[in-house]
Amino acid sequence: VEITRRGLAPWLEGQRIARIVVRVPKLRWPVPPEFARRLPGARVAALDRRAKWLLLRTDRGTALLHLGMTGSFRVLRDDRPPAVHDHLDIVTGDGVTVRFNDPRRFGSVLWTEDDPALHPLIAPLGPEPLGDDFTAGYLHRRSRRRSVAIKPHIMNAHIVVGVGNIYASEALFRARIHPVRAAGRAALPRF
Protein backbone atom coordinates (compact mmCIF):
# COMPACT_ATOMS: atom_id res chain seq x y z
CA VAL A 1 0.00 0.00 0.00
CA GLU A 2 2.93 2.33 0.68
CA ILE A 3 4.20 1.71 -2.86
CA THR A 4 0.76 2.62 -4.21
CA ARG A 5 0.71 5.77 -2.08
CA ARG A 6 4.12 6.85 -3.35
CA GLY A 7 3.07 6.23 -6.93
CA LEU A 8 -0.18 8.20 -6.66
CA ALA A 9 0.95 11.10 -4.46
CA PRO A 10 2.71 13.11 -7.22
CA TRP A 11 -0.44 12.91 -9.37
CA LEU A 12 -2.86 13.94 -6.61
CA GLU A 13 -1.20 16.12 -3.99
CA GLY A 14 -1.84 19.81 -4.58
CA GLN A 15 -4.37 19.08 -7.32
CA ARG A 16 -7.97 20.21 -7.41
CA ILE A 17 -10.45 17.43 -8.04
CA ALA A 18 -12.58 18.14 -11.09
CA ARG A 19 -14.99 15.24 -10.82
CA ILE A 20 -15.66 11.84 -9.33
CA VAL A 21 -17.19 9.00 -11.32
CA VAL A 22 -18.66 6.12 -9.32
CA ARG A 23 -19.65 3.28 -11.64
CA VAL A 24 -20.32 0.67 -8.95
CA PRO A 25 -21.91 2.17 -5.83
CA LYS A 26 -21.19 -0.88 -3.65
CA LEU A 27 -17.74 -2.31 -3.13
CA ARG A 28 -17.10 -4.03 0.19
CA TRP A 29 -19.51 -1.46 1.61
CA PRO A 30 -21.64 1.11 -0.21
CA VAL A 31 -19.64 4.09 -1.48
CA PRO A 32 -20.94 7.01 0.60
CA PRO A 33 -22.76 9.64 -1.51
CA GLU A 34 -20.66 12.34 0.21
CA PHE A 35 -17.57 10.98 -1.55
CA ALA A 36 -18.84 11.96 -5.00
CA ARG A 37 -20.73 15.01 -3.76
CA ARG A 38 -18.03 16.67 -1.61
CA LEU A 39 -14.82 15.92 -3.54
CA PRO A 40 -15.36 17.86 -6.80
CA GLY A 41 -13.70 21.24 -6.33
CA ALA A 42 -11.71 20.11 -3.30
CA ARG A 43 -7.94 20.52 -3.20
CA VAL A 44 -5.89 17.47 -2.22
CA ALA A 45 -3.65 18.39 0.70
CA ALA A 46 -1.94 15.01 1.06
CA LEU A 47 -2.17 11.33 0.29
CA ASP A 48 -1.18 9.51 3.48
CA ARG A 49 -1.26 5.91 4.61
CA ARG A 50 -2.40 4.33 7.85
CA ALA A 51 -1.90 0.57 7.92
CA LYS A 52 -3.53 -0.67 4.69
CA TRP A 53 -5.67 2.45 4.27
CA LEU A 54 -4.88 5.31 1.90
CA LEU A 55 -6.03 8.64 3.32
CA LEU A 56 -6.86 11.19 0.60
CA ARG A 57 -6.87 14.36 2.69
CA THR A 58 -8.61 17.36 1.16
CA ASP A 59 -9.77 20.76 2.32
CA ARG A 60 -13.31 19.30 2.64
CA GLY A 61 -12.67 15.98 4.36
CA THR A 62 -10.81 12.73 3.92
CA ALA A 63 -11.53 9.77 1.67
CA LEU A 64 -10.42 6.46 3.20
CA LEU A 65 -9.45 4.06 0.42
CA HIS A 66 -8.72 0.36 0.89
CA LEU A 67 -7.52 -1.93 -1.90
CA GLY A 68 -8.99 -5.10 -0.43
CA MET A 69 -7.46 -8.25 -1.91
CA THR A 70 -7.44 -7.39 -5.61
CA GLY A 71 -7.83 -3.62 -5.87
CA SER A 72 -5.42 -1.33 -7.69
CA PHE A 73 -5.18 2.24 -8.95
CA ARG A 74 -4.01 3.31 -12.38
CA VAL A 75 -3.05 6.78 -13.52
CA LEU A 76 -4.41 7.63 -16.97
CA ARG A 77 -3.65 10.68 -19.07
CA ASP A 78 -6.06 9.80 -21.87
CA ASP A 79 -9.79 9.19 -22.32
CA ARG A 80 -9.48 5.42 -22.14
CA PRO A 81 -12.89 3.81 -21.63
CA PRO A 82 -13.32 1.97 -18.35
CA ALA A 83 -12.81 -1.79 -18.24
CA VAL A 84 -15.30 -4.14 -16.65
CA HIS A 85 -13.81 -3.91 -13.13
CA ASP A 86 -13.00 -0.17 -13.18
CA HIS A 87 -15.35 0.98 -10.43
CA LEU A 88 -14.47 4.62 -9.87
CA ASP A 89 -12.44 7.53 -11.22
CA ILE A 90 -10.90 10.51 -9.46
CA VAL A 91 -10.32 13.14 -12.16
CA THR A 92 -8.01 16.05 -11.35
CA GLY A 93 -8.18 19.57 -12.71
CA ASP A 94 -5.26 18.92 -15.04
CA GLY A 95 -7.11 16.02 -16.70
CA VAL A 96 -5.39 13.09 -15.00
CA THR A 97 -7.68 10.20 -14.09
CA VAL A 98 -6.86 8.01 -11.11
CA ARG A 99 -8.92 4.87 -11.76
CA PHE A 100 -9.77 2.23 -9.15
CA ASN A 101 -10.02 -1.34 -10.45
CA ASP A 102 -11.15 -4.18 -8.19
CA PRO A 103 -12.25 -7.49 -9.75
CA ARG A 104 -13.50 -9.00 -6.48
CA ARG A 105 -14.92 -5.75 -5.03
CA PHE A 106 -13.35 -6.30 -1.59
CA GLY A 107 -11.90 -2.79 -1.62
CA SER A 108 -13.66 0.12 -0.01
CA VAL A 109 -14.16 3.85 -0.22
CA LEU A 110 -15.29 5.70 2.89
CA TRP A 111 -15.63 9.39 3.72
CA THR A 112 -15.12 11.42 6.88
CA GLU A 113 -15.12 15.10 7.65
CA ASP A 114 -13.65 14.39 11.08
CA ASP A 115 -10.12 13.40 12.00
CA PRO A 116 -9.57 10.10 10.13
CA ALA A 117 -7.53 8.80 13.08
CA LEU A 118 -10.83 8.69 15.01
CA HIS A 119 -12.69 6.68 12.36
CA PRO A 120 -13.92 3.37 13.86
CA LEU A 121 -11.88 1.32 11.37
CA ILE A 122 -8.67 3.31 11.96
CA ALA A 123 -8.80 4.18 15.68
CA PRO A 124 -8.25 0.65 17.08
CA LEU A 125 -5.18 -0.05 14.94
CA GLY A 126 -1.81 -0.49 16.61
CA PRO A 127 1.24 1.62 15.76
CA GLU A 128 3.26 1.36 12.55
CA PRO A 129 6.25 -0.97 13.09
CA LEU A 130 8.74 1.66 11.88
CA GLY A 131 7.11 4.55 13.73
CA ASP A 132 8.28 6.20 16.93
CA ASP A 133 5.38 4.73 18.94
CA PHE A 134 6.49 1.16 18.32
CA THR A 135 9.21 0.19 20.81
CA ALA A 136 10.35 -2.95 22.58
CA GLY A 137 8.73 -1.62 25.75
CA TYR A 138 5.42 -1.07 23.98
CA LEU A 139 5.38 -4.60 22.54
CA HIS A 140 6.42 -6.09 25.87
CA ARG A 141 3.60 -4.23 27.68
CA ARG A 142 1.02 -5.36 25.08
CA SER A 143 2.23 -8.95 25.44
CA ARG A 144 2.02 -9.24 29.23
CA ARG A 145 -0.35 -11.91 30.54
CA ARG A 146 -1.20 -13.03 27.00
CA SER A 147 -1.32 -16.77 26.45
CA VAL A 148 -1.73 -16.55 22.67
CA ALA A 149 1.31 -17.63 20.63
CA ILE A 150 3.69 -14.74 19.95
CA LYS A 151 3.51 -15.05 16.16
CA PRO A 152 -0.25 -14.41 15.75
CA HIS A 153 0.04 -11.83 18.54
CA ILE A 154 2.48 -9.66 16.57
CA MET A 155 0.44 -10.22 13.38
CA ASN A 156 -2.64 -8.75 15.08
CA ALA A 157 -3.28 -5.27 13.60
CA HIS A 158 -4.61 -4.07 16.97
CA ILE A 159 -1.13 -4.70 18.40
CA VAL A 160 1.01 -3.53 15.47
CA VAL A 161 0.02 -2.97 11.83
CA GLY A 162 1.75 -4.29 8.76
CA VAL A 163 3.38 -7.39 10.19
CA GLY A 164 2.52 -10.29 7.91
CA ASN A 165 3.59 -13.90 8.01
CA ILE A 166 7.05 -13.43 6.50
CA TYR A 167 7.98 -10.40 8.63
CA ALA A 168 6.71 -12.13 11.77
CA SER A 169 8.73 -15.28 11.02
CA GLU A 170 11.90 -13.31 10.28
CA ALA A 171 11.59 -11.05 13.34
CA LEU A 172 11.01 -13.97 15.67
CA PHE A 173 13.91 -15.91 14.17
CA ARG A 174 16.26 -12.94 14.66
CA ALA A 175 15.01 -12.47 18.25
CA ARG A 176 15.40 -16.21 18.86
CA ILE A 177 11.80 -16.51 20.04
CA HIS A 178 9.92 -19.67 19.05
CA PRO A 179 6.73 -18.66 17.16
CA VAL A 180 4.42 -20.77 19.35
CA ARG A 181 5.80 -19.42 22.63
CA ALA A 182 3.12 -17.61 24.63
CA ALA A 183 3.38 -13.88 24.02
CA GLY A 184 3.39 -13.21 27.76
CA ARG A 185 6.40 -15.47 28.31
CA ALA A 186 8.82 -13.55 26.08
CA ALA A 187 11.32 -11.53 28.09
CA LEU A 188 11.83 -7.81 27.43
CA PRO A 189 15.45 -8.20 26.20
CA ARG A 190 14.16 -10.47 23.41
CA PHE A 191 11.85 -7.75 22.13
Task: Label every PLM stretch briefly.
Residues 4, 41-42, 152-154, 166:
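Generic hydrophobic-segment detector
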Residues 63-161, 167-168, 172-174, 182-186:
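Phosphate/anion-contacting hairpin/loop surfaces
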